[in-house]
């Protein structure tokens, strides 16, 4: 859309009022917003135009004067580094000019909630060329339109403000820069502390809610106030529900708990899953065997990560390992590995993709997903067009094997049922499921595992009270 009439810019600013407060400049290096703005313009393939993005507004709950928890829009953050409400930005591509607009000063807001960000504070904190109050936004946009409207579009994010900057055009977020990697690394460090704390104290716990509570407490006490996603602490059969978030059932009589939880640091996510025996050792041979299969799936996939690899190939490898392991246990039967894979039978037990990008979102954006989900109701069809891994990507490797009662019942009427021994599979329902997930940075020579949360033998040593840490 080309904006030719300034009157169409529906922005209603308050009167400008600039109150200057002096604060100490942050010792941290600034978020590389200008670099990201240039990167997005490059991916758009244009040398002209204006990128205009709106930050998250302050919003109250319905029928209430209480505000909803604030979470900055990730596209806005990527081009600004601003984690404050009610801000805006413009990036003049031709003139390489990034401008951040902060809220007008409100004395009432300052008295009740504290003062909002000033332009001087913003200048000290953020990497941009200009900092202005919201009151100047409409006139600035109209001036830009008057100067360039004949041949320069305004790029915005949502369909109501076309043309839009879509996930495809912001594929620049696929490859992380040095700053972003540091943030993801820090998020993983705190997540690892929280996961370790759970292992050291789970013998005292009697309900899933206690696991969630201690994980949150550990993260907040180490400066990570926000989680990357809702904590999943599913015990027993709940571990077979991929995004189980009720976290309110007793642990007594359960074999395992699947803890999928990751801290957020400066808006960047971590995504970590550990499956923990509820005791000092494996509660059953069934639980031990399923953990061993998933452990092998993850280890074999992780060691192959490198630039140029098609992630879909790792996804397929994980399925092959799962099929062979379940065949040995007698859960899968009556066919070759290839026949079982083609039928989709392994997707009854491994129904999700092997991984995804991690960044400003826990499932970060990319031009094209690096893998595809399994299918529960149709034959598997390979997808060969999935993209290759690149240096600087941060991805998860998160295989799992689950015994979901509903999924098993539904599959009885499918053609793939001939490959499943349902009597044997139902013996594993008390196990629930096992998932193990790490965050991997793709490097020039292979990978770096950013996730330090204990698993496998180290996990068992902590549960048995033998760990030195």
Curated annotation (Swiss-Prot):
**By what name is this protein known?**
Probable Xaa-Pro aminopeptidase AN0832
Q: Specify the domain of life of the species encoding this protein.
A: Eukaryota
Residues recorded as binding Mn(2+) 2, renumbered to this chain, are 260, 271, 437
**Residues annotated for Mn(2+) 1 binding in this entry:** 271, 398, 437
What family does the Swiss-Prot or TrEMBL record give for this protein? Belongs to the peptidase M24B family.
Alphabetical UniProt keywords: Aminopeptidase, Hydrolase, Manganese, Metal-binding, Metalloprotease, Protease
Top EC group: hydrolase
Q: Any note on cofactor binding? A: Binds 2 manganese ions per subunit.
Q: Which GO terms describe its biological process?
A: proteolysis
As recorded in UniProt, its EC number(s) are 3.4.11.9
What SMART domains does the database record attribute to this sequence? AMP_N
> Which terms does the record give in the GO molecular function aspect?
manganese ion binding; metalloaminopeptidase activity; peptidase activity
What is the protein's known function?
Catalyzes the removal of a penultimate prolyl residue from the N-termini of peptides.
The catalysed reaction is:
Release of any N-terminal amino acid, including proline, that is linked to proline, even from a dipeptide or tripeptide
Needed cofactors: Mn(2+)
Family matches, as Pfam families: AMP_N, Peptidase_M24
